[in-house]
C-alpha cells in the first residue's frame, strides 16, 4: 500500500467515469437514426469541427449549424438538443464512492474533462456534480483538450497540488498514460470494482 506521499487530490474524467459519455459515436448514431440523418456525412462534419466546440471556441448552436442545421430539417433545434441532453445518465455507485472518499479522507476533487460548454453546464447542474467536485477543469473553460499536457498542468496549478499527491481516474488509457508522464498516479477506469480496488491500493479505502 502506498502511504507516502499520501494522495490528497483526485482528478476525474466525467464521461465514462461519473456519467455516461455526453456525445460519443454511439449517441450520434442514435441521433442519426432517430432524426433520419445521413450518419456518415454527419460524422465527417462532426470530426471536422468538434474539437473547436470542446475547446470552448464554438457554441453548441454553432456546432449544430455546421453538423446538422446547415440545411432545412423537419425537426427543430430544440428537439435535437433535448435528445442530446437526455442521453446523459449517472453512474450512482461511482458518484457515491467519490463522495465517500472525499468526506472520509478530506480529498480535493477536480474534474479534468473534454466537453463543450453547454453539455458541461447541463451535466454539472442536472446531476449536482458541484456537491462532489471542487474544481472543473473542462476543455471548454481552459481552451485545451486532453491529451495536451497543459490540461493537466493547469489542473495542478488550479488545485495547488504536486503531481505525486494526485490520483487520476479516466477510462481512456492514453489520457492516463500522459498524466503518468507528469508524475501523476493513474487509474484506467474499467468499472466500479476495479477502480475501488485500485484506490484502496493507494490508501483510499471507503469505510462502511
Where are these predicted regions, by residue range?
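Asp-based, Mg2+/Mn2+-dependent phosphohydrolase catalytic module
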Residues: 2-7, 12, 116-117, 121-208
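Alpha-helical elements of Rossmann-like donor-binding domains used by nucleotide-donor carbohydrate transfer enzymes
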Residues: 26-30, 48, 62, 66, ...
Amino acid at each position: 500500500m502506498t502511504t507516502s506521499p499520501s494522495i490528497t487530490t483526485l482528478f476525474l474524467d466525467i464521461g465514462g467515469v461519473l456519467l455516461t459519455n455526453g456525445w460519443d459515436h454511439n449517441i450520434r448514431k442514435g441521433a442519426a437514426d432517430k432524426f433520419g440523418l445521413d450518419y456518415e456525412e454527419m460524422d465527417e462534419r462532426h470530426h471536422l469541427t468538434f474539437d473547436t466546440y470542446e475547446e470552448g471556441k464554438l457554441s453548441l448552436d454553432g456546432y449544430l449549424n455546421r453538423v446538422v442545421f446547415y440545411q432545412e430539417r423537419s425537426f427543430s433545434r430544440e428537439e435535437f438538443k433535448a435528445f442530446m441532453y437526455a442521453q446523459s445518465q449517472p453512474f450512482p455507485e461511482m458518484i457515491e464512492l467519490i463522495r465517500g472518499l472525499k468526506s472520509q479522507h478530506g480529498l480535493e476533487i477536480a474534474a479534468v474533462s473534454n466537453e463543450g460548454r453547454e453539455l458541461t453546464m447541463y451535466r454539472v447542474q442536472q446531476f449536482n456534480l458541484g456537491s462532489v467536485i471542487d474544481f472543473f477543469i473542462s476543455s471548454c473553460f481552459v481552451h485545451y483538450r486532453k491529451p495536451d499536457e497543459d490540461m493537466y498542468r493547469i489542473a495542478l496549478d488550479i488545485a495547488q497540488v504536486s503531481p505525486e499527491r494526485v490520483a487520476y481516474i479516466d477510462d481512456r488509457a492514453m489520457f492516463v498514460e500522459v498524466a503518468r508522464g507528469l508524475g501523476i498516479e493513474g487509474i484506467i477506469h474499467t468499472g466500479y470494482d476495479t477502480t475501488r480496488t485500485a484506490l484502496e491500493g493507494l490508501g483510499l479505502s471507503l469505510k462502511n
